[in-house]
Amino acid sequence: MARPVTRPSRRTLLIAVVVVGIGLSVPGANAVARSDASLSNATPERAPGAAEDAAVRAEATQLRARYHADPAALLASAQAALSAGRNDATIAFFLKRGWADRMNAALERYGAMLGSADTQTLALADAGIQHYATQLHASLMQSGPARLITISLRAQRLTAYDRGRVLVDALVTTGRPALATDVGAMRITRKDSPWTMQSPWPKGSPEWYPDTPVRMVLWFTENGEGLHDASWQPDATLGPGSQNGPYASHGCVHLPLAAVTTLFQWAPIGTPVVVYPGDGSAAATQVAQQTVDAAGNPLSGVRGD
């Protein structure tokens, strides 16, 4: 025989509502709710990694076809991009840009694949290297200082960027090996025009030089290193290798007059100046050659000319 249905009393309903309400308010329930929300929000965060991987693989297919699966051509393409990416990563590290860590790690991960003889692997390495090298440069231009001067010692080249746009691109001559231009992140500290360079070394010293007038100079250290014109040096002698030649400086950076004139008018005091090896080696190797302290003060002693 069926038992009669018993309806809950108002007191019972009230207790049930209170219990349910307490259950929904306890930390565990909220944690589950937050966890579900986090999972739904996490999907878009993972998507860029998958998208990047797909983009790299698609580019690898195109590169393999473009170079007709020639391993030498793929390797040359990858090595050029790897050098450029490492140099940009070095500048970013000197400027203490935290975003460079992930991109540089990915760049080196693909770079480690270049020892393979398999063309598919080489194509993937080339594509990955180019992808992250491009990202490094774009990020440096977009989130780096609005005004930035970089000097590559290997290329003997100065590049000045104004909000990511190249303003000056000029061949230079830096310090001779015995008085090499300092490496690291420095800044414009003073500007003078005209100026007469005076030797900090006594007459009779192998480093002595006579008083030398220049049209203008932008100092980037407190020990005598600056960017200036050099009327005694033909422009044709500027560029790669000139730091080992007869016109090599005592630590300063020689520039064509037109280039230094533009910089003098454009660069305010405080403009960052990054001098880096620029030899395409791993960023960690290049950063280890820094010769300035954390404040950008050179540790190398007096310089000049």
Residues covered by each model-derived region:
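Exported/periplasmic cell-wall-interacting domains
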Residues: V17-G21, A58, Q62-L75, Q79-A84, ...
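N-terminal export leaders
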Residues: R10-L14
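Gly/Pro-biased beta-strand-loop elements
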Residues: T134-G239, F264-Q265, P298-G304
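Amphipathic alpha-helical assembly segments used for oligomerization, scaffolding, or translocation
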Residues: V32-A106, A125-I129
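Second-shell loop/turn segments in exported
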Residues: A92-F93, L114-G115, G144-R147, R215, ...
